Amino acid sequence: MSVPTDRSYTAEHEWVLVDGSVATVGITEFAAEALGDVVFVQLPDVGAQLTAGEACGEIESTKSVSDLFAPVTGSVIEVNSAIDAGPETVNSDPYGAGWLFRVEIATAGELLDAAAYAALTSGE
């Protein structure tokens, strides 16, 4: 399982790549594999105000429906509209083209570095 070191992670299996005051958010390879084939993603609306730790969307797979949680507090400034037409991208490229949304950060949540996230998932 891949855990890129250039980003932070949450205990809910989301990754956060911060560039200045903007966080790009996606789910980890671990989450994508656990979900199975993703068939639908409900993303927050552009302009939505998110609070770190609160549910902000859903990912539906052939196995289950899982909540997406906001890793940071802030305002959604962009969503990956390509996910609507190709939700399987979340499985095939979770750390690249499968990103989900971008947030203008007001406050960062409790984030893990790559080593801490790898340790968390090694026991699951």
UniProtKB/Swiss-Prot annotation:
Residues 22-104 form the Lipoyl-binding domain. The glycine cleavage system is composed of four proteins: P, T, L and H. One of its GO terms (biological process) is glycine decarboxylation via glycine cleavage system. NCBIfam families: gcvH, PRK01202.1. GO terms for cellular component: cytosol; glycine cleavage complex. Its cofactor is (R)-lipoate. This is Glycine cleavage system H protein. Belongs to the GcvH family. Disulfide bonds: none annotated. The glycine cleavage system catalyzes the degradation of glycine. The H protein shuttles the methylamine group of glycine from the P protein to the T protein. The gene is gcvH. Pfam families: GCV_H.
